Amino acid sequence: MEEFQGYLELDRSRQHDFLYPLLFREYIYALAHDHVLLNRSIFFENAGYYNKSSSIIVKRLITRMYQQNXLIFSANDSIQNPFFGHNNNLYSQIFSEGFAVIVEIPFSLRLVSSLERKEIAKSHNLRSIHSIFPFLEDKFSHLDYVLDVLMPYHIHLEILVQTLRYWVKDASSLHLLRFFLHEYWNSLITPKKHIPIFSKGNPRLFLFLYNSHMCEYESILLFLRNQSSHLRSTSSGIFFERIYFYVKIEHFAKXFFDNDFQCILWFFKDPFMHYVKYQGKSILASKDTPLFMNKWKYYLVNLWQYHFYAWFQPGRININQLCNYSIDFLGYRSSVRLNSSVVRSQMLENSFIINNAIKKFETIVPIIPLIGSLSKANFCNTLGHPISKPTRADSSDSDIIDRFLRICRNLSHYHSGSSKKKSLYRVKYILRLSCVKTLARKHKRTVRTFLKRLGSEFLEEFLTEEEVVLSLIFPRTYSTSRRLYRGQIWYLDITSINDLVNYE
């Protein structure tokens, strides 16, 4: 038990105080404002607080915070205080973004020191989303079962605050965070099917709190995973017999609630366990038996309910066989397929037919959800037919074309790892025709007339970035570059998920 506590306390050694005074510094809110501007979507029009925020509003907010009871932005202020009643949402957005910048400081300093200690010069190479898929392609083709887990999102507010206490020792900041969460939780969080949907005005703070909570949960899983290869072997006579399974379960639960983790470790000796998390989902894949996967399922349910005090329904964890299951992950639909090949072997006068089955990891783009996202962004209707997108009257033709080109290239860049490009061709067709209809609507002309005016050069502008790069690398072998483009291409410079991909 002491070893386990030491493992959890290892990354908490750097603790920082006196974060509360930073709330009264204007540059903190300027940093938050710049962060939102740099990361705003090019797909959706959003008149968020970055269009309304100004230094005058920030100064007014800081002035009010100096006054007594200034941080009470509740609904009652709409009657008692017209100023806050009119700008209630705007002030809460500015405050939450600024507070998120402050509480991220201890984590940022810890990350920098960790990278310096490990002598990692280019940490951005480790953050690419596409780097996950070569790992899955290399590992999952050798595994048999997968646990598809939907994380519980009904987390008590006090649990989130208690998690931060290990990192932030500033009591004033924690009290302020507790008050802010209790005031705004219901208005800023909208529970959806599986995960909470944070309001577009306040995503950074709540994503930070949720991820810090997930970090606490994953530290225990990582400890079990790292220790599993060093466990002593267990007798298989009783351990794997189904008749004694429920007896072992009772002992396992008692050991867990007594915090005796050494008994728990006996249950998880699996060098082939792999774990990946994305938003409110996580995947645990293993080469072991269904019985072993059921033990992991039971452990996860009890871990969330009795350690994190969050209700976790067993139905939110599904055990599936990889060869018959598709994983929706990061905008891709991944699966392990068996490719059969028949080989005829001739030995003297005898001939043999050998049937070889090879596992192959495939990733495709699910077209129906992607068309749904295009429909929400007003590029097409629900059936996938392109429509004109409303634009401002002062937008030039070059600005409209450039915006559509950036969207098309970003989507092609992100989905370059698809093993089948047919879905991408359809998406490019929708964006291209939507661009033409938008321009024709602006100039009050028909689509056919406007296409004749633009000519074939307009269609060539929608040539994807991958095709251009490969044509430069293989200028004399066009067929080679085309064949490479049709294959899977993973990039190491993708650090964020497209809003059109994030359709869940």
Swiss-Prot record:
GO terms for molecular function: RNA binding. The keyword Chloroplast applies. GO terms for cellular component: chloroplast. Keywords: Chloroplast, mRNA processing, Plastid, RNA-binding, tRNA processing. InterPro entries: Domain_X, Maturase_MatK, Maturase_MatK_N. It is found in: Plastid, Chloroplast. One of its GO terms (biological process) is RNA splicing. Usually encoded in the trnK tRNA gene intron. Probably assists in splicing its own and other chloroplast group II introns. Belongs to the intron maturase 2 family. MatK subfamily. This is Maturase K. The gene is matK.
